[in-house]
Design a protein with these regions (language model features):
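Lipid interaction determinants
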Residues: 2-8, 12-147
């Protein structure tokens, strides 16, 4: 009884934290991809910014967050190449976001190729330079202010 109650307490307590990493190969589409590197720099895990993530949804639509604003747009996949277009974002002022939002948008703008290896999604530009790395996560942050 006590161990069962403890298990539920830990489960409920852990649901309030940011995305948890999932193991095993993940599909490119429909997976919550949490940004861990943008333009060669690690994405900091700070409480003051929203989680930076990307979801490639059905019918070529995408949504996510650049660390400050919600983003949405379109994507096209063809033989390992990727093209992001019709990008739109909210226009909130985020003092603590630094340049993460700019790095996220630039990574999507310059991406030409995509690979998925296990739990990682990587975007590469036309010079085959890696511009972003994302990690598959089971869900987004339970805190709406962080989404």
């Amino acid at each position: 009884m006590v161990s069962g109650l403890f298990g539920w307490t830990v489960l409920v307590w852990s649901l309030g934290f940011a995305a948890q990493v999932v193991s095993g190969p993940r599909p490119l589409e429909g997976t919550y991809w949490k940004a861990i590197e943008l333009q060669g720099k690690q994405v900091p895990a700070r409480d003051s910014i929203r989680e930076v993530y990307l979801v490639l949804a059905e019918r070529g639509r995408l949504y996510g967050s650049d660390g400050c604003n919600h983003v949405a747009g379109a994507y096209e996949l063809k033989n390992g190449s990727v093209r992001f277009s019709e990008m739109a974002a909210t226009r909130m002022a985020c003092i603590d976001a630094g340049d993460i939002d700019v790095a996220f948008r630039e990574a999507l703008k310059s991406a030409k190729r995509v690979t998925v290896a296990g739990e990682h999604l990587e975007l590469f530009d036309s010079s085959n330079r890696r511009v972003a790395v994302f990690l598959a996560a089971s869900s987004h942050s339970a805190d709406p202010a962080k989404r």
